[in-house]
Amino acid sequence: TARAVEIMKELRCPLIVNQRRYSIFDRAIEQDGVKAWCRENGMGIIAFSPLAQGLLTNRYLNGIPEDSRMAKGAFLKKEALTDETLQKIKVLNEVAGTRGQTLAEMSLAWLLKDDLVTSVIIGASSVAQLADNLKATENTDFSAEELEKIKKIIQK
């Protein structure tokens, strides 16, 4: 990333965002130093796959729906929905409920609370799904207790 920034500056086309996979489930950007580097260099982050390909929605709470990407083997493999992951999804869903949000809304809000995240890329397949996802912007404030609960759920 650092070298790409140098090249683009030389070309007078500065990079201003870094697009990375980022979600409650996938926080590699926090551990590999890229997020810190972006902050130090004034670069925003665009999060893609913010709902972990649908895992961070209510879609898989009761198993694998027949019409889902997972059932069709497209993008998301059945192996991704382990008993441990399903349990985490269910507990996260409970936290979302206490916030008056769906799991998807809370998962998006969790990203949008971060001033470094300039945008999230969502893959809504209907207008209704898009409208539901946009509700995440109505409550992006998290208490320290909520953030700690989420952290503990993910670290189990």
Where are these regions (language model features)?
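Beta/alpha (TIM)-barrel catalytic core signal, keyed to glycine-rich beta->alpha loops juxtaposed to Asp/Glu
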Residues: T1-Q155
